[in-house]
Amino acid sequence: MTKYVFVTGGVVSSLGKGIAAASLAAILESRGLKVTLLKLDPYINVDPGTMSPFQHGEVFVTEDGAETDLDLGHYERFISTKMRKANNFTTGQIYESVIRKERRGDYLGKTVQVIPHITNEIQAFVERGAASATCGEPDVAIVEVGGTVGDIESLPFLEAARQMSLRLGRNSACFVHLTLVPFIATAGELKTKPTQHSVQKLREIGIYPNVLLCRADRRIPDDERAKISMFSNVPEDAVISVWDVDSIYKIPQMLHDQGLDELICEELKLTARPADLSIWSEMVEKLENPKSEVTIGMVGKYVELTESYKSLIEALRHASIHTSTKVNIEYIDSEELEENGVDSLKHLDAVLVPGGFGRRGTEGKIKAIRYAREAKVPYLGICLGMQLAVIEFARDVVGLKDANSTEFDQDTPNRVVALITEWYDREGKVEKRTEESDLGGTMRLGSQRCPIKPGTMAEEIYGKDVNERHRHRYEVNNRFVPQLEGGGLIISARTPSEDLPEMMELPRSMHPWFVGVQFHPEFTSTPRDGHPLFKAFVEAARAHHEASVEEKV
């Protein structure tokens, strides 16, 4: 039978519940247990797909095409279990499901209320999510409850967790509460009162935490832990200090050293072998002892909130681990390039243009792409970054000066990138869309396998085929491919059913390393293995850096 660990948060948001939950999962998995994770989001949006990256951060896409919270990316990076649509649900989905049932008459004329109907639905979603785990029936399902204790939006989720714990019985569920212990500089001391109040609030709604994870910018002294223990009625050995570190991949070892996994196993009566975190120690060792260093410029319009590119940043860190190369990322606002030109790019060892939507900042990205192509600087374009690379090539090499995407200019005569109106989904069914379609859930989403053209750089990186995740509406227009190929551009991978361009590159006779991909490879990168495309990109950046140093000498 699956046992549950509910992870809640208090005092403030953004303390790192997702990292804490993923780290605990990693330790339990290293003990031989089958683990899955779920994220409950209290917002009323059905999913984060149409939310602004400035508001929500990155949208993480699962293998089965769900647009989910970025914490699911952390989950996949920390454990081997793959996430699915059922691993993340929102208040919007819960209410949508309950209202649909009410309209069908499933409640037999009863008054539909938050308790029991909404809370029962939440419990059903949690159990269904755990049961659908890709690892088979999990020993442990770790359930992260979004928001903070005291938020009105989170109350139904917390009540559902309380009811579920009671229903499942002793040793079947436990609660881990992540809370803030701030350091007040003027007083020169850590303050435990916010944590005391947070636990008190949790207890008021009937939840008694088994473990406290106390976040601070420094290690919390034992006397402060004892104080927290006394006022929160949590045993002192279950008051765990979680301090700031320079790499999230150090956190599993930090939590294990303080016995978190043993506490959970004891509380849930789980029998498991000792934890083996050697792989995490090795990763941290490689991360901290690089043999070379490169600087990569990430050119985007959401650079003020780097959470918008979370998986991409982590994928570069993974490549750093596996190439023994320190990767410094410079975030470059594409709108500034439109105004000030590309001089700010000239010290970079490589340029990366990530995915995005909308016209704003696109001409700045195109300037960056032209610079990378002409200066022979390694370039990687992801999703929109590939589309803009094709547009730049069409304009500046092929000579189609007004080439554009219909996303930005409906009237352009040279629609090099356009909206595809019909395609096959993962089940082989025909999906259709138009400019007037709803934004939510109308993109090409999820994993798709496609063959790679022999003799290309793509084949060197991936092998015979590629299986990556998608999130986009617009595609490179096949009508212009002959002209693009006539200019030297290579379409190195295509979808098998619709024959749509999935990868492009320039031959080495034109550029040492210039690659664009329509999919999002960052979603499948893990610290354990890295990702072949990002490793190749970092190696190309390193080669460019070394060549530049030799030229200066």
UniProtKB/Swiss-Prot annotation:
GO biological-process terms attached to the record: 'de novo' CTP biosynthetic process; pyrimidine nucleobase biosynthetic process
Note: CTPSs have evolved a hybrid strategy for distinguishing between UTP and CTP. The overlapping regions of the product feedback inhibitory and substrate sites recognize a common feature in both compounds, the triphosphate moiety. To differentiate isosteric substrate and product pyrimidine rings, an additional pocket far from the expected kinase/ligase catalytic site, specifically recognizes the cytosine and ribose portions of the product inhibitor.
Protein name, UniProt field: CTP synthase
Subunit organization: Homotetramer.
Positions bound to CTP: S13, D151, I152, E153, K191, T192, K193, P194, T195, Q196, K227
Family that this chain belongs to: Belongs to the CTP synthase family.
Biochemical pathway: Pyrimidine metabolism; CTP biosynthesis via de novo pathway; CTP from UDP: step 2/2
Chain positions recorded as UTP binding sites: S13, K191, T192, K193, P194, T195, Q196, K227
Residues the entry annotates as binding Mg(2+): D71, E144
Lineage: Bacteria, Pseudomonadati, Pseudomonadota, Betaproteobacteria, Burkholderiales
